Amino acid sequence: MTLKIAIAGAGGRMGRQLIQAVHSAEGVELGAAFERKGSSLVGTDAGELAGIGHLGVAVSDDLESQKDKFDLLIDFTRPEGSLEHIAFCVANNKKMVIGTTGFDQNGKAAIKAASDKIAIVFASNFSVGVNLVFKLLEKAAKVMGDYCDIEVIEAHHRHKVDAPSGTALSMGEHIAKTLGRDLKTHGVFCREGITGERKRDEIGFSTIRASDVVGEHMVWFADIGERVEISHKASSRMTFANGAVRAGKWLENKANGLFDMTDVLDLNNL
């Protein structure tokens, strides 16, 4: 059976890439595409919006009217919109792939609660390469983390509204967990003025917002006399879109539960 996928935020940069990714993937088809209420894009053909030609799927601003046209919703929007979509999917037994970042603790708790009813893949980054980097960071932290300074540096396009990026925070969390540290306590997100000497157990974060940078992340494990750098650079959003579709296909036979790309890629068995 073909998995029918809906895309939230279809008119955005990521939404258009997701439409392309669904169209080119095997075993799935685009069932619906959504935009915010009153959007000028409502009624536009989703394929034409994404630059791949007519698909016969019109952009809608009403999930209820389209609920019989999809099995799974891919959502890369904003927290407030995603939470509305989560409530709808729980009420209508739809699976979800969530790539939205910037959720507060209440938002994350809502996702966890929803996963008791439906199957969800929730990840800060759907790139296969980035998720492999998460595992490499755990290995590096285990070997070097207690003996060096750790810094996470990330860069994104000027339109990104949250900082540090969800991926950078996930990198910090993987490192902190490996070292038995609490990122809330040991993470340093701003340095200005007279800061005093750096503490060895800090995990520092630096953010760059410029131009059209798709996404770059680098982690330093810096010791006296040597430094190990682990980095990832994305040159196209298609890497995230393809990963999200892969996650959706992986969810097809899952009834409920909260998963991430580590599960999708079976990275714990590396």
Curated annotation (Swiss-Prot):
(S)-2,3,4,5-tetrahydrodipicolinate binds at H157, G166, T167. It is an enzyme of class 1 (oxidoreductase). It is found in: Cytoplasm. NADP(+) binds at R36. The active site is at H156 (proton donor/acceptor), K160 (proton donor). Keywords: Amino-acid biosynthesis, Cytoplasm, Diaminopimelate biosynthesis, Lysine biosynthesis, NAD, NADP, Oxidoreductase. The keyword Amino-acid biosynthesis applies. One of its GO terms (molecular function) is oxidoreductase activity, acting on CH or CH2 groups, NAD or NADP as acceptor. It holds the Pfam family DapB_N. It catalyses: (S)-2,3,4,5-tetrahydrodipicolinate + NAD(+) + H2O = (2S,4S)-4-hydroxy-2,3,4,5-tetrahydrodipicolinate + NADH + H(+); (S)-2,3,4,5-tetrahydrodipicolinate + NADP(+) + H2O = (2S,4S)-4-hydroxy-2,3,4,5-tetrahydrodipicolinate + NADPH + H(+). NAD(+) binds at G9, A10, G11, G12, R13, M14, E35, G99, T100, T101, A123, S124, N125, F126. The keyword Cytoplasm applies. Its main location: cytoplasm. One of its GO terms (biological process) is diaminopimelate biosynthetic process. One of its GO terms (cellular component) is cytosol. Its EC number is 1.17.1.8. Catalyzes the conversion of 4-hydroxy-tetrahydrodipicolinate (HTPA) to tetrahydrodipicolinate. Belongs to the DapB family. HAMAP family: DapB (MF_00102). This is 4-hydroxy-tetrahydrodipicolinate reductase. It comes from Haemophilus influenzae (strain PittEE). The gene is dapB.
